Amino acid sequence: MKKLSKVLLALLILISVGCGKKKEEKKETKEETKTEVKEDKKLNIINEESKERPYAVVINNIEVARKAQTGLKDAQVIYEFLAEGGITRFVAIYKDKDTAQIGTVRSARHNFLDVAFEYDAIFVHFGGSTYGYDDIKKLNVNDIDGMNSSSFWRENPYKLAREHTAYTSLVKVKKEASKKYRTTTDTKWPLNYSKDEVDLDGISATDISVPFSNYTKNSYKYDSENKVYKRYVSGKEHVDMKTKEQYTFKNIIIAKMGWKMTDSNYYLDIQDVGSGSGYYITNGKAIEITWSKKDRKSRMIYKDKNGNEIKLNDGNTFIEFQPTDQKTTIK
C-alpha cells in the first residue's frame, strides 16, 4: 500500500511539472508576440533619409520643340509656368537621380527661381532673361548655366533652331556642382506625402483640361488600371523623345494664379506669392484646395477645404501654375 502511494505521488509531481512547463511555454509565446515590431513603410518617390541637394532644371515646352523633350520621367515633380507669348516652360525637380539626358534645356525666368528655393535646389538653365539673371545674382542662387558650362551638349534630330537643341545630364551637372557649391541639404522636401494610399472624397476626375493660353492647352486622362494620369498637349500624347512612352503622373495639383506683363519684351511676372485656389487630383477624384506662399523663398502650402494640409499619393506630381483667366474643366 505504501509503495502504491509513493508511485501515485511521483506521478502527480511529474504531471504538475509538465503542465507548468506548458503554461510557461504559452506565456513565453505570448510575450514574444507582443514584442514583434512592424517595419515602417518607406516612400518610393523620394529617399527621406537622403541629404543630397535636388536639381531644378528649366525645360523647353514650345510646341515645335516638345517632341525633343526627354528625361522628364525621372523628375519627382514638374512645375509648369506661363511664359511670354502664351508658351509655357517647365521646372523639373530631380533628387537622387543620375538621368543620362534631360532636355531640351532653356533660359531662366525670375519666377522659376521661386520653385528652386523651396527645395534648396541647384538651378540648371541655359541663358536667361534680364530679370532672371538679375535675381540669380542678387539672391545668390547656386546655378549651372549652359552659356558657360561644359555640362551641356547639342543634339538636333528634328532640324530645329539652335535654341531648341541643348541637353544636359545629371551626372555632368552633379560633377560640376561638386566643384562649385554645397551639394547636401537639411531642407525638408516641401511636398507632403502619405505612405498609405490616398482616395479623395471628391468629384469624379477622369478627364481634365488645364489650358494656359490659346497656344498651350493641356489635358489628362485617367488610366484606372494603372491609377495614373496620361498627359496630352493640344490633343496629342505628351511623349518622351527617347523612350517613345507617354508621360504619366500619379498626382496633379492645379494652383490658379494671376500674372502681369513686366515690359515691352513680354516678360511676365507670375503672382506666385500670396494665396489662391486650385485643385488636387489623384486616383480618379478631385478636391478643391487653397495655396499660399509667404515669400519667394518659403514653401508653397496646399490645404483642403477644412484647412488641413493635403497629403499626396506616393508618386510623381505635375503642378500646374494655371493663369486665373483660364478655365479648368474636370469631368
PLM feature segments, named:
Residues K2-A10:
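Sec-dependent signal peptide recognition
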Residues I15-G18:
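C-terminal motif of bacterial Sec signal peptides marking the signal peptidase cleavage site
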Residues G20-K22:
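Bacterial signal peptide processing site
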Residues K26-A75, Y79, E84-K331:
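A surface/extracellular/periplasmic glyco- and lipid-processing/surface-interacting theme
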